[in-house]
A protein has these predicted regions:
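Conserved PLP-binding active-site segment in aminotransferase class I/II-type PLP enzymes
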Residues: 1-72, 128, 142, 147, ...
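Generic structural signal for small/hydrophobic residues in well-ordered secondary structure
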Residues: 22, 44, 62, 77, ...
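Conserved PLP-anchoring active-site segment centered on the Schiff-base-forming lysine
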Residues: 64-120, 125
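Helix C-cap/helix->beta junction micro-motif
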Residues: 94, 148-149, 305-306, 370
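Active-site phosphate-binding strand-loop segment of PLP-dependent enzymes
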Residues: 106-189, 194-196, 200-201
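Active-site region of PLP-dependent enzymes
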Residues: 160-166, 173-284, 316-319
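Conserved PLP cofactor-binding pocket of PLP-dependent enzymes
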Residues: 212-218, 258, 262, 297-331, ...
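Conserved PLP-binding active-site segment of the aspartate aminotransferase-like
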Residues: 275, 282-291, 321-329, 340-353
């Protein structure tokens, strides 16, 4: 029986080519700030429709550096509670105050109505997280809201490389965007990230901060920065992935459509709402289970009996994490309810269409056997 992991990087049989390029790098001695970084930044700015791109050592670093460039010290930044902790931690590390918002269960992304309630005179901006690579219409509505209130919009696009809503491309919707190249992401270099922006002021400040705060054109250090740079070796790996981005997204969408077709809204499952104008990247495929289904029982059966992994993440929610203990009594009811029933199915390139069909068949079989026959809801 084929074992299917929750996530796994795929290199299109480019391992030898990557190894040869890295070998040349090792012989050249040029392992930092070289031509591969420049090429990666140039190609990312084109791919994500922005004027500028800055390579950094992680997606979390990308957010932190952007927030420092946006000068959020002692100001509030609205973030969804359902996200990886790096989103909120970056606000704190940049000197700001994270204000946690509820999520819209239909999209898994930040709830606009809660955002509207929490914008005040202290608000510097909003971070929009494209959860699981879903690109909802609400990002366009949020852009208008931020512009109206004269606050920034930062895209956390860790899951959304190559996504779009209509003609709006992820990476050039907000004032800046942050992508992750972590091992399990849509594109990977093992570790790493990229900042995109069409604002030269933000670009120049970010470029300085990642290089210890040094001015780009002279020996003076104007900011309290650090070494947040990506290496040439990581850039080689990222470039090898970037050339296949369309193929990667096409595959993930093909797998997602199989899940959509075979795990219909019924007594057991509930799908997220997907807009016809959304070009999603499906970092993973999210689906809600009904209250009667035990996630732990389901996962054990999927792994032991059928050989595939069902995952869930971002639990506890950010406002329930010990590092944000002062926020723990905050009531974000939608997120607190849905996080307990959310599971994720694999969409990576080692999952073939036949595997996805088998996963659906096995999930339906488990639920029927344990929880009764299907009934419409």
């Amino acid at each position: 029986m084929k074992k299917i992991s929750g996530a796994k990087p795929y290199f299109f049989r480019q391992e030898k080519n990557i190894a040869n390029k890295i070998k040349k790098l090792l012989h050249s001695g040029n392992l930092s700030q070289g031509k591969n970084i420049s090429e990666l930044e140039k190609k990312c700015s084109k791919t994500f429709n922005s004027k500028f791109a800055i390579a950094v050592n992680s997606g979390g670093t990308a957010i932190e550096v952007c927030l420092e460039a946006l000068d959020i010290k002692n100001k509030e930044v609205l973030v969804p509670t359902q996200t990886f902790i790096a989103t909120a931690n970056s606000v704190v590390r940049a000197g700001g105050i994270p204000v946690f918002c509820d999520i819209d269960p239909e999209t898994g992304c930040i709830d606009l109505e809660d955002v509207k309630k929490k914008i005040n005179k202290k608000t510097a901006g909003v971070i929009f997280v494209y959860m699981f690579g879903i690109i909802p219409k609400s990002i366009i509505e949020l852009k208008r809201l931020c512009k109206k209130n004269k606050i920034f919009l930062l895209e956390d696009a860790a899951h959304a490389h190559g996504g779009s809503f209509g003609k709006n491309i992820v990476g050039d919707i907000g004032d800046a965007a942050c992508f992750s190249f972590y091992a399990t992401k849509v594109l990977t270099s093992g570790e790493g990230g990229i900042i995109t922006t069409s604002n030269k002021k933000i670009k120049d400040k970010c470029s300085s901060i990642i290089n210890h705060g040094r001015n780009l054109h002279n020996p003076y250090f104007n900011y309290s920065g650090n070494n947040f740079r990506l290496t040439e070796i990581q850039a080689v790996i990222a470039l090898s992935q970037l050339k296949y981005l369309k193929k990667i997204i096409s595959h993930r969408n093909k797998i997602a459509k199989i899940y959509q077709k075979n795990l219909i809204n019924n007594l057991f499952f509930k799908q997220l709402s997907i807009d016809k104008n959304s070009k999603n990247t499906y970092w993973r495929y999210p689906i809600y289970l009904s209250d009667q289904i035990s996630r732990n029982v389901l996962r054990k059966l999927c792994e032991k009996k059928y050989g595939f992994r069902v995952t869930w993440m971002y639990e506890p929610l950010c406002h329930k994490q010990p590092v944000f203990n002062s926020k723990s009594k905050l009531k974000l009811l939608k997120a607190e309810k849905t996080i307990k029933s959310l599971i994720n199915l694999p969409t990576h390139l080692f999952v073939k269409p036949t595997d996805a069909i088998r996963i659906c068949k096995n999930l339906n079989e488990i639920c029927r056997n344990l929880y009764g026959k299907k009934k419409s809801i």
